Amino acid sequence: MIALLTGKLAYKSPEFIILDVNGVGYQVHIPFSTYYTLPAEGGALSLQIHTSVKEDAINLYGFRTQQEKELFQLLIGVSGVGPKLATGILSNSEPSELADSLVNGNLARLSAIPGIGKKTAERLVLELKEKMKKLGLAQPQAGGATAPAKQEIRDDVLSALINLGYKEAVVQKALAELKVTEDATVELVLKQALKILMK
C-alpha cells in the first residue's frame, strides 16, 4: 500500500492533484483542507496517502497531515461512509470543527453536510464520539500563495461547491450575499458561503 508520496506538483484542482514522483504522475484525491495548503504547480510536495483498493480501481487520497489522514480513516470506518463522502465531510468542515460536532452530538451541523442524512449523522456520532476525544486535531494551515482576483475566487468557490453537491443557482445566491474584499482568499470565501448554505 502507498502511505506517503513526495514529488513535484504537476497539476492541482479542488478535487484532485497530479503528483509527479520521479517521472510517474499519481492522481490523488484531496479535501479542501489539503487544497488550500498546496504550493504553486511545479513546487515540491509531500502527502500522507490512503490507498483505496476495489475490484475495478485503485484510488489514492492525500492529506498534508497525519491527523487529517487518521480522521479520514476513522470516517470511512463508519458503515455507509465511503472515501468520496469522507472527503466531502472534510471539505465541508475543518477537522477541529468536525471533531467538536461529533463530540457534542451536533446532528444539525452534521446533517447540513451534503450526502449526510440524519441517520448517517447519528451513526457518525455514535461510532466516533469517543474516538474524537482521543484524537488531537490541529487547525489546517493557510497557504502562502498570493490572493487571486475576485472573479477567480468566486469561480473557484462556485466550482468547489457544485462538486460537493450544491445546486448552481443556490450557490450563486449565496455568493451574491457575500462581499469579496481585495484581501479575500478562496478558503475564506468558501467558509463564508458554507455558513450561508448551512443556515
From Swiss-Prot:
Segments carrying the region annotation (Domain II) are: 65-143
GO terms under cellular component: cytoplasm; Holliday junction helicase complex; Holliday junction resolvase complex
Q: Does the keyword DNA damage apply?
A: yes
Q: Where in the cell is it found?
A: Cytoplasm
Domain note for this entry? Has three domains with a flexible linker between the domains II and III and assumes an 'L' shape. Domain III is highly mobile and contacts RuvB.
Q: Which HAMAP family match?
A: DNA_HJ_migration_RuvA (MF_00031)
Protein name per Swiss-Prot or TrEMBL:
Holliday junction branch migration complex subunit RuvA
Question: Which organism is this entry from?
Answer: Geobacter sp. (strain M21)
Q: Which gene encodes it?
A: ruvA
